């Protein structure tokens, strides 16, 4: 086992604080409308330019192991805030730095660290309650656009695009961000259910100019099995031909004789058919077939539940207004499914999302909800260079997370004002701890709540104390707009922060800061001295004389 380096008390805390400050100072320059960029060097390719706090934090690794421990713990604050709300990483880092700095001063002055932590926790619980009172619902497109604009660093086109996307696919809909091919940002909305499976044979194509298949008011056969024998399909094909409508077959696979016969029938115009593979694999495929069945009012023909293809009638088939199939995708538009049944299915999947443990499962279930509930929107980010594209895409993703958080828990006045109002309300209510040390902890937390506003002002090149005092003297959503350098009603000016983002930033900052204040000892590996490690193998050189043994 490697030897350890151990530091105690003040020695440990000073080292840890130095690491915290290096990381936080690098992150906090990005805060606010006039925050600066940070350039990250990559071992390959061009450097990345970012204004995203968590991206800066993730790059920092310090040489001194004790300082690095401090930096890594604050990095955790940014990561947790990012995971919970998708934004507010810089605010969380600034809050953590302030609580740790003030808290360690109090510890050095002889306060009890455990009581300080309890005081900080009391103040944070009270602040979260105050934030909930200050929160207003974010329901209309204008508010959503404003939140997106602020989060995307005052880029109003991004805010507008996100608001349009949410309007089209609903607040629960799936919105993805992709790299576009032009200079302008674009919004692409796919209505109806789309899945990533294309036609099984190009001979089904009936729109040669677009290379796609379009079926108007088709019947939809859903089969959870491979279809290779055409005989089991005959009753259904005859019934569909009599009805004079096209047929879409979605099955595990259609192959051999069955596929060949379907192609011949289509080319001769006897019955208009198209076949695609069912989306997904294994259990997920079964679930997605069931989703399509709910959407189109059909039944999944599965031998597991005793249904056979030969006995399938028109009643078992789903229907939709229109289906469009190309090489890679199938879109079912306006399924005839019962609205109540679709909502029931959506509620069932939402329950699964709550129970899911892995992010991948949650994402896939969320996609299924969107496909059933409204559709999918794709924001294509445009930029002149690859470096700008990466930076912009990260900003748009942040803005999207922020708007989702705003829809979930509402919004508060931005620019650090909400935390100042929460702190003022706690002071006015006269929150007290069980002893004097806890009271100091409460003061530490309340002072830290001013730090985001102060940092925004510093980054804008103004005097922090003057502006902080002016904002404190006001009430409600009165604050300072660092972008236009004027005071006023932040909500009226469209400067909003999602309540969830502000709340998460404060809670995670206080959680990690509390642990660091109560640290008394730090242990790390001593650097190993590898210089003598290779010396032992040198004595084998004499073996060369063994050639004469033959």
From Swiss-Prot:
Gene3D superfamilies given in the database record: GroEL, GroEL-like equatorial domain, TCP-1-like chaperonin intermediate domain
Catalytic reactions of this protein: ATP + H2O + a folded polypeptide = ADP + phosphate + an unfolded polypeptide
GO molecular function, a single term: unfolded protein binding
One GO BP annotation of this record: protein refolding
Keywords, sorted A to Z: ATP-binding, Chaperone, Cytoplasm, Isomerase, Nucleotide-binding
The organism's place on the tree of life at top rank: Bacteria
SUPFAM superfamilies, alphabetized: GroEL apical domain-like, GroEL equatorial domain-like, GroEL-intermediate domain like
CDD domains the record matches: GroEL (cd03344)
Annotated positions binding ATP: 30-33, 51, 87-91, 415, 497
Subcellular location: Cytoplasm
Entry EC number(s): 5.6.1.7
Intrachain S-S bonds: none
GO CC annotations on file: cytoplasm
Quaternary structure and partners: Forms a cylinder of 14 subunits composed of two heptameric rings stacked back-to-back. Interacts with the co-chaperonin GroES.
Known role: Together with its co-chaperonin GroES, plays an essential role in assisting protein folding. The GroEL-GroES system forms a nano-cage that allows encapsulation of the non-native substrate proteins and provides a physical environment optimized to promote and accelerate protein folding.
Family according to the record: Belongs to the chaperonin (HSP60) family.
Protein name: Chaperonin GroEL
